[in-house]
Amino acid sequence: MSKRDFYEVLGVSKGADEREIKKAYKPLAMKFHPDRNQGDAASEEKFKEVKEAYEILTDENLRARYDQYGHAGVDQSQGGGGHGGFGGGADFGDAFGDIFGDIFGGRNGGGRRGPARGSDLRYTMELTLEEAVRGVSKEIKVPSLVHCEVCNGSGAHTGSTAQTCPTCHGAGQVQMRQGFFAVQQACPHCHGRGKIIKDPCRKCHGEGRYQKTKTLSVKIPAGVDTGDRIRLSGEGEAGEAGAPAGDLYVQVHVKEHEIFVRDGNNLYCEVPISFTAAALGGEIEVPTLDGRVKLKVTPETQTGKMFRMRGKGVKSVRSGQVGDLMCKVVIETPVKLTESQKELLRQLDESFSGAAAKTHKPRSEGFFEGVKRFFDDLTR
């Protein structure tokens, strides 16, 4: 099945910068996240599609490949990990190497030149809003290929050594003639390594590395948000025959909070207040991530009014600036009234009628006057 355009998936233009891409990604990731759509296979596929698009378009190198070659330029780079939520990285040549390898009889038309660097891995870490705002250290378990400590990555059994390949004489490549062309390809005898292991290591079976789930401690800085990525250098898969290891990229996903909604460095919440507090004003308690604080409500406050509490938001992980907490007032209508309470409200409402209506209820009176004028105009 053909893939959708990554820019279309996120709903951004091809000229979108990283900030715009991140802003588009967050609501989509929250909408289709498996935790919110348990058992919904369609939403899970959508989440994977959105996540893949974000990872490609926020990686400068991968985005350049995608812009030039489309999906063919990045599909191989994202594949090869095969460890649950992980994906391995690969050199750009690998995206097309198999095509030429099939034609000329080898894995890559140009042949492999020495041991390959280990693949990069990806891990998605879920955080609560509190953990993201304050920072946290967490242990994660990562399935990976690790360096064999028994043979020290050589692949040879203790007491033996790898022998120079008699076919390519250690070059890792052989020259093959295809009609008029002489083509370099990976040596089929040693698979491009230049060495032959006759007595392989019992632990890694001659590979120099083996599969293991390793435990890592990851320090998450304060202020991270959904879409942020943390690179752990050298914590990816071990390289072949002592080549450098790849990197591990920890992708942050912040779970929804029951009270607060985050937008950049600002936090938003709704605060219910009684209609008497709204009319007369006073102090109310509002929640913050540091505990409850007092908020002064001005008299005659209308529902929907926003109060700003400076410095009660999130400290930026990049600039160090602290955002604000925006409290939206929602006036609560009293319920389950007694007869005496209903009578008091009727008396109060009557006191607002007549000539006093415009003074005490300017918005509603203005609205109904506007409605009356509208219908009067229709009947003329």
UniProtKB/Swiss-Prot annotation:
Ranges occupied by CXXCXGXG motif repeats: 148-155, 165-172, 187-194, 201-208
Keyword vocabulary terms for this entry: Chaperone, Cytoplasm, DNA replication, Metal-binding, Repeat, Stress response, Zinc, Zinc-finger
Predominant location: cytoplasm
Domain statement: The J domain is necessary and sufficient to stimulate DnaK ATPase activity. Zinc center 1 plays an important role in the autonomous, DnaK-independent chaperone activity of DnaJ. Zinc center 2 is essential for interaction with DnaK and for DnaJ activity.
NCBIfam families xrefs: DnaJ_bact, PRK10767.1
Assembly and binders: Homodimer.
Protein name, entry field: Chaperone protein DnaJ
